[in-house]
Amino acid sequence: MLNLGVAAMYRKTLKHVCGVKNVNNTINKPFNNLTIKFLNVLSRLIIENKENKSYPDLITFAFWIRNSKILFIKKKLDNLESKVSKGIIFHISPSNVPLNFAYSFVFGLLTGNSNILKLPNKNFPQVKIFC
């Protein structure tokens, strides 16, 4: 089971943003099917919302996490069966790039890790849409 929860750090205060509050630190296999399905559903939700069309960076992100693209990336990697996840990853993203945290989050998920994200301090609409 993919136990998703997003905790974000705002100005040194950890705040639960979405998902489950008590995330079990379960190590998943890299590029597991449940994560790939989740990303594909997220992609569709972002693309299908007409209001998101005014944010090209968000639409680009949504196309990047589509099933076909993730499977293409997976196919390019060698020996995924021998790879082991680390457990929990803490991401600190720059405050001047709205969706940098989302790309880090995806890489964390795809490598089978639980993630804690520090969201940008600036009030970007893309961050609110994503979270």
Where does each model-flagged region fall?
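N-terminal Rossmann-like NAD(P)+-binding subdomain of aldehyde/semialdehyde dehydrogenases
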Residues: M1-K86
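Conserved small-residue-rich beta-alpha loop and adjacent elements
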Residues: K75-C131
